């Protein structure tokens, strides 16, 4: 018995307006059923409210669609099959892609004498080609601007963890799935100099990755978590990318907690090719959070900038994606996009309380498996960041470990003397001292009396 190949590492998500998801999903399934019945590459999700896209006039530079899907079908499998696919593309809801732009000028020569179709102006364009030999191919092509082509090859090779199967001066492709009769390819095509890319806002490429912590610092744009296992970013030309983390407790992911807690990391964090250990990753996050504290990175999962620089939003910050099956997924939860590092500085007991409370609220969070379209749990608003901490931390009181860390009469006496000396200080000094006690005495062994006196003298200096 022949072993079935592993599922492809890439999935294409298409975002449809409310009420159109089921129709578009059925249309794609019927089209691809005779080509690749074993895999479901295209998944349609619905938005809760329609989105308006504002196109800018580009009089000096021609615009080219950022994504296309080409079907290479063999002639010897029957003309009826080929005619059936072509006939399906010529009926509603398919629309013929115009060969001229708004100014009446023809599109670049790449589309010359070729017919393309689309389900929406913000979805990929589709085309059919005949092949005489070899396997049938479904090729998802990303068109890259002239200057970004080489960088795009390195980016997708890093995400896919493989080299390009074939690479030429202006074209390359990766084989993501193959059988004896069918192959799935992701290809990159370099556009002529002076041609800009028009990214499709309703199209998202999702890739399965094993680790997100070592990948995030090497991405060209900020990467933000939009759910427990999914992170969103974009490539050099503005195409949306989803990174789906394969949870594995052996890789440092505990209770679904992402190993990288800062969602606004960019390519300037680490040099290309560097690797991080958990300790160095935490230190890097702390240093970067200090550097960008005054900088305002306002990146959401559905608000991405146009090539012209003006952000185009797919909706409000509370826009929900709803799959064709009727379930919903938050596309840009504002409270999820900014994970915090404060739990790293708590003593073990307090951190367990924080994680326990976070996990209890995560059970109420709506998480939709976009691969199946089913909502895993019910949706409830997440609590504020301050409410996640124990009450003793909310009121700036030291944790309970301080009351039990001192034992014996000598320790009690030193504690009374210490409190008497601290009492006349202003409130700010008391708050700072409390913070020192939390950081120094809880997670570390109890210091000797000499060290405690040195700490007191240093504090008063």
Curated annotation (Swiss-Prot):
UniProt GO cellular component terms: nucleoplasm
Bias-annotated ranges (Low complexity): 323-334
Assigned protein family: Belongs to the FAM124 family.
Protein name: Protein FAM124B
Main location: nucleus
Residue(s) carrying Phosphoserine: 49
InterPro entries for the chain: FAM124, FAM124_dom
Subcellular location: Nucleus
Chain intervals for the UniProt region annotation (Disordered): 302-346
């Amino acid at each position: 018995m022949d072993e079935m190949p592993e599922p492809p590492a890439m999935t294409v998500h298409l975002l449809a307006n409310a009420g159109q998801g089921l129709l578009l999903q059925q249309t794609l399934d019927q089209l691809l059923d005779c080509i690749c019945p074993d895999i479901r590459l295209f998944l349609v999700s619905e938005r809760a409210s329609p989105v308006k896209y504002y196109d800018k006039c580009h009089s000096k530079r021609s615009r080219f669609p950022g994504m296309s899907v080409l079907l290479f079908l063999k002639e010897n499998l029957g003309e009826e099959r080929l005619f059936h696919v072509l006939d399906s593309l010529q009926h509603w809801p398919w629309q013929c892609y115009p060969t001229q732009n708004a100014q009446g000028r023809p599109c670049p020569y790449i589309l010359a004498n070729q017919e393309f179709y689309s389900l929406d102006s913000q979805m990929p364009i589709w085309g059919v080609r005949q092949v005489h030999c070899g396997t049938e191919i479904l090729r998802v092509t990303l068109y890259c601007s002239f200057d970004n082509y080489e960088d795009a090859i390195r980016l997708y090779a890093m995400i896919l963890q493989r080299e390009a199967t074939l690479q030429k001066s202006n074209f390359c492709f990766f084989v993501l799935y193959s059988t004896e009769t069918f192959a799935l390819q992701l290809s990159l095509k370099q556009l002529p100099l002076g041609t800009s890319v028009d990214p499709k806002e309703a199209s998202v490429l999702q890739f399965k990755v094993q680790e997100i912590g070592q990948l995030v610092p090497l991405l060209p744009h900020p990467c933000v978590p939009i759910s427990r296992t999914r992170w969103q970013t974009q490539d050099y030309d503005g195409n949306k990318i989803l990174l789906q983390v394969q949870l594995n407790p052996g890789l440092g992911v505990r209770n679904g907690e992402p190993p990288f807690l800062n969602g606004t990391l960019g390519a300037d964090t680490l040099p290309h090719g560097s690797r991080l250990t958990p300790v160095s990753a935490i230190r890097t996050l702390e240093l970067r959070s200090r550097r960008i504290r005054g900088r305002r990175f306002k990146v959401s999962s559905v608000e991405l900038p146009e090539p012209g620089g003006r952000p185009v939003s797919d909706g409000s910050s509370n826009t929900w994606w709803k799959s064709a099956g009727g379930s919903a997924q938050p596309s840009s939860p504002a409270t999820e996009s900014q994970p915090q590092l404060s739990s790293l500085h708590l003593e073990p007991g307090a951190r367990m309380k924080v994680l326990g409370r976070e996990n209890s609220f995560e059970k109420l969070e709506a998480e939709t498996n976009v691969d199946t379209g089913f909502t895993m749990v019910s949706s409830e608003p997440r609590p504020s960041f301050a409410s996640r901490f124990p009450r003793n931390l909310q009121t700036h009181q030291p944790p309970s470990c301080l009351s039990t860390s001192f034992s014996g009469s000598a320790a009690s006496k030193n504690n009374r003397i210490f409190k008497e000396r601290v009492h006349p200080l202003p409130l700010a000094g008391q708050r700072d001292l409390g913070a020192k006690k939390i950081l120094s005495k809880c997670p570390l062994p109890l210091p000797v009396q000499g060290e405690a006196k040195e700490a007191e003298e240093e504090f008063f200096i």
